[in-house]
């Protein structure tokens, strides 16, 4: 990881599980919507003395129920780079099965367009959940 390479990195939790693991952070799903961006910005400001901040995401920009939280964190944290989390073969939004999940290239474009509002930002990686495919297919 980053710390093993001598990089001063900090995980900034935005959900209850992340807070339990890290010991600090803000539970963004409990913040009033008008203040999510400010809470994300405050989380960054409190930890800006580190070289790299890894901001935990909540929800998804393509989930109609939780996209406001995701967008608030995105704009408030003003990232320089993103790592997308993607589940292979998942084509419907959980809990709202009539809503299709776009293909990964389209999700990447959505995130990059919305993250470039304040400063340059790009997707630098994908964390892939491959539980629905074989190990051989996951390595393709």
Regions of interest found by a model, annotated:
Residues 1-140:
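Flexible phosphate-sensing "switch/lid" loops adjacent to ATP/NTP-binding sites
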């Amino acid at each position: 990881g980053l710390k093993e390479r001598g990089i001063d990195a900090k995980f900034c939790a935005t959900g209850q599980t992340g807070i339990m693991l890290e010991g600090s952070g803000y539970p963004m799903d409990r913040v009033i919507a008008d203040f999510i961006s400010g809470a994300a910005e405050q989380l960054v400001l409190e930890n800006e003395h580190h070289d790299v901040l890894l901001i935990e995401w909540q929800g998804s920009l393509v989930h109609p129920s939780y996209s406001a939280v995701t967008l608030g964190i995105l704009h408030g944290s003003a990232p320089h780079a993103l790592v997308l989390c993607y589940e292979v073969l998942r084509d419907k939004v959980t809990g709202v099965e009539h809503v299709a999940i776009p293909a990964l290239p389209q999700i990447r474009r959505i995130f990059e367009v919305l993250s470039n509002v304040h400063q340059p930002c790009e997707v630098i990686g994908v964390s892939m959940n491959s539980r629905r495919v074989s190990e051989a297919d996951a390595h393709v």
